[in-house]
């Protein structure tokens, strides 16, 4: 189940020029973005662990995105 609110998802889609966005479209994009976010978070956590830190920092996120 998607946890990302649907309103920002609809805004993102509408910013591309879409006039209307179906509920299914919002749900699909939200689910995909959550999956990608989880992958990035896992990798960032690994980066922090390698650096012997418990805290995930912005630089860990940036490096995780590059690694994926």
Regions found by a protein language model. Give the residues of each.
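Terminal helix-to-tail segments of small alpha-helical proteins
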Residues: 1-68
